[in-house]
Amino acid sequence: MKELKILESNEIGHGLLIEMDAGWVNPKDKLNLDLIQESRKLDYKAPFEFFAVLQKHDIPNRNGRTYPEKILKREADKYKKIIEKGLSTSELNHPESSLIDLDRVSHLITDIWWDGNILMGKLLLLTSPGFHERGIVSTKGDVAANLMRSGVTLGVSSRGVGSLKKVGEKNEVQDDFELICFDLVSSPSTPGAYLFSNKEDRDKYDEKLEEEKKVEPVSDVLKLMSKLDRYLK
């Protein structure tokens, strides 16, 4: 199989598209707070489920890319079928591959829906019995759950394959785009990528859209994530 090139920030062409600022899983959000408190009991029967922002359409992201509404909604509809089949696994930290490595799987996307131009989702962390019963961290899902229980906000990195084309001032994702998954990553703060609990939060998001365009490219972050990945292995 021919290895796909990872397209860097503001680069056009065909390759692997990784969006470090796609969204967030915020443990301090009021919709997640009850779930976090329940998870602290380490009850084996209690699942680690969280709400998250997964992606956004028609908004230029930090990589200088825009996902058109038609394309992202089409891929979201396809992904719903993957969810129904129980195949919507994703990884902790993004690999430089279009394939999902089962040894690195940390969570399952159990539901997705739209809130305006925001693709929302529900994640189930795939934790081990040892983590629930004794707090032993042995899997990627355990690592993610332990971070969430400690109040760490995790980034959501969408992963897909497709082409980018310069359209006016934007690098626009083309019709050949195929969504692969939504990985959990450690990402620097990005204004606006959070769960909208109320209208006030949505207004704050609208006010900070321009700030996203001023953030530096994520090449340094990708290097940092590679080091973190080696540490977790």
Where do the model's predicted regions map?
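Short conserved beta-strand and strand-loop elements enriched in small hydrophobics
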Residues: I83-I100, V156
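Short coil-to-beta-strand transition motifs
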Residues: D101-D103, D176
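Charge-rich (especially acidic), low-complexity segments
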Residues: V215-K233
